[in-house]
Amino acid sequence: MIKCNVTINGTVSRAATVRTNSEGQTFICFGVKTTIPAKSGAGKQVEISVSMDGGESDTNPYAVGTKVEMRGTLTFRKRSDNLYLNFHADAVDFTPASDKDNIEGDIEFRGTIGKQVEEKTDKKGGKYLVFSAFSTEKDGDAFAFTWVRFIRFSAEREAFLVPK
């Protein structure tokens, strides 16, 4: 399981619609595009499916092209070779503090550490750890594996940082 408590700045890319869950409660769904910066400067644009509590009267401000800052929980779902980003918003601000697209927050990861935990040294002599881990999710009768590459900016190893 990969779950992130984050703040996302982005642009509404799909108009809000109202849906009803299996318990009869209504919620709003819309899409947001944001850019994840790359070292080269180009960045990668991602589409995030957003849901939040609300009804028909709450859909008006979510027009395509509107800049938003949202706080909530981001989860990842892998179906075959596709990775989907789903976000449940607790709060949405239509006057974001920054116009820059970004995702900031904390990640909660439950999974298995890969075969290597490497200690490396940066240009200034500081030590850090690099390792990969995967999370498993059941997709029908099969299992889907999502690999994540971690960089820990400290050479300190906790007991759980043991390669498989």
For each predicted feature, which ranges?
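Single-stranded nucleic acid-binding surfaces, predominantly the OB-fold ssDNA-binding core
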Residues: 1-164
